[in-house]
């Protein structure tokens, strides 16, 4: 997957190690307070996957303080699951009761406050409630994605049969299956969400802790995009960093750090 963001991170690291030779991006803490404070303010200009105004609004509502919540936001911020964002935020902050489809599913859904977010959770629900094997659970996930009625009817019968063996009433099992099916239509693969969330967190960490280096690298990869340059210039000024105009006698071909509080 070719992403400009990966090149920005790489160039940012090259700038950082000029002063901090021991810096390793893979060793940064995933519980950095400055990073979460920045995200909770919706300060996401230049941050991978989190830069839109809509995402900034979600982060201000959520006030994330752990990496798992960044993964969930990446998965939820899409048509369909987006409807669950208000409940996700409210449940985190105790403004809404956390409810589970069944008490047996607390371990499966606790991380996401009782809301089905990932395809993997659909598979785990089938395993816990209806004794599906991992292979069977994957077939269920695929069937729910395809919405082929014949397959769905077979899966529903299998799901209810397994649930009854775990002392769950047929009517309740049928209701749970229908609810899971509804969510499964837009469930996101957690491993994909985690990969994107990690890049998002890394860019947020770099901006929070090494703003000069990060913004310099970001500017240089936006050099042919006037609107992006203007946005980044506004962000730099908001952070009280000076932004010098080009000088034919002194400027480099690309943006660079002049001093600790000045770009050129």
Spans of model-derived segments:
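Noncatalytic, beta-rich nucleic-acid-contacting surfaces in large DNA/RNA-processing enzymes
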Residues: 1-264
């Amino acid at each position: 997957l070719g992403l400009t963001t990966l090149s920005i991170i790489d160039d940012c690291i090259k700038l950082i190690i000029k002063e901090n030779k021991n810096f390793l991006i893979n060793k940064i803490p995933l519980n950095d307070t400055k990073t979460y404070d920045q995200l909770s303010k919706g300060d996401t200009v230049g941050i991978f996957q989190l830069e839109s105004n809509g995402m900034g609004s979600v982060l201000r509502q959520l006030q994330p303080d752990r990496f798992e919540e960044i993964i969930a936001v990446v998965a939820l911020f899409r048509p369909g699951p987006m409807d669950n964002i208000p409940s996700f935020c409210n449940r985190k902050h105790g403004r809404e009761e956390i409810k589970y489809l069944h008490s047996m599913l607390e371990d499966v859904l606790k991380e996401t406050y009782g809301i089905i977010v990932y395809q993997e959770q659909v598979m785990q629900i089938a395993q816990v409630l209806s004794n599906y094997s991992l292979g069977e659970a994957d077939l269920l996930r695929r069937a729910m994605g395809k919405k082929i009625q014949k397959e769905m009817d077979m899966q529903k019968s299998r799901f209810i049969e397994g649930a009854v063996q775990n002392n769950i009433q047929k009517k309740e099992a049928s209701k749970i299956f229908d609810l899971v099916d509804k969510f499964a239509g837009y469930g996101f693969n957690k491993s994909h969400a985690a990969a994107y969330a990690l890049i998002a967190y890394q860019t947020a960490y770099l901006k929070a802790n090494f703003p000069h280096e990060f913004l310099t690298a970001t500017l240089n990869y936006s050099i042919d995009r006037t609107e992006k340059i203007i946005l980044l210039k506004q962000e730099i000024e908001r952070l009280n960093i000076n932004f010098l105009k080009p000088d034919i006698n002194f400027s480099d071909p690309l943006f660079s750090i002049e001093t600790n509080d000045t770009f050129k």
